[in-house]
Amino acid sequence: MDNFKMNFGSYKHSTGEYYLSNVRMGLLVAMFSIGCAIGGLIFARLADTLGRRLAIVIVVLVYMVGAIIQISSNHKWYQYFVGKIIYGLGAGGCSVLCPMLLSEIAPTDLRGGLVSLYQLNMTFGIFLGYCSVYGTRKYDNTAQWRVPLGLCFLWALIIIIGMLLVPESPRYLIECERHEEARASIAKINKVSPEDPWVLKQADEINAGVLAHRELGEASWKELFSVKTKVLQRLITGILVQTFLQLTGENYFFFYGTTIFKSVGLTDGFETSIVLGTVNFFSTIIAVMVVDKIGRRKCLFIWCSWDDGLYGHICKYRG
């Protein structure tokens, strides 16, 4: 976006154009991911101290503060830089707390699909982001990049309003010895009476799980690396899955898509980004529909095999 480059880039006298250096562009993009990583770590604890709903409201407010700092930036790339980090802190907190609340309030038979729905909404948000940028790309003022950022407030407000309507996690309430509220929450989620025998049974099962967890005592970081259990094996598996997912390079296209598409000769990289976002969204819909039917591991194997085939085809074509 030309106006964005004019505000936060450097002027090149030889061409008479503004540009973003590779270092500055890399920092502006990377700081969001770094903020997400830090936010996921530091805000996760709020779920146990303040409750899932209030914790989500707090991280969304942090997200909004980051957006305000970015929108108010004017010819100060370092201000935008700071806003990007804070923006990421809020997004990282949401990425931990929202699936946590979903998994604890969702009915058992819908839990997998609803947690997957979180990822679906993320891909839909990416698609809407591409559309908003496409719609403002021809503006010749700061609205070119401020409008897409400003739209983030809409999604943040929807989350905050949603937290007023969603019941608190029954598990959190039982952990706080608020058993009556926990039963009311279970009843509201399943649209039955708080005195229903099924509600009482569910509350007892959650309470038993909480008590069993307490009997195990506080876990230590050292236990993560113990070879006496399978915790280390699961930890390594989880880390490797996420690591290899990033190494496939898919996020490279999401972050630098318009630049990449223009560099290979496409006239409008913004249109191609919308196509990418559309494919990403509908692929996630398929995953949500089948995850509970064929299982998580099998889904992972199928999609990884599909990716391998596509990458092999690309390598053969390029060769």
Where are the regions that the model predicts?
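Alpha-helical transmembrane bundle of multi-pass membrane proteins
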Residues: 1-189, 198, 204, 208-319
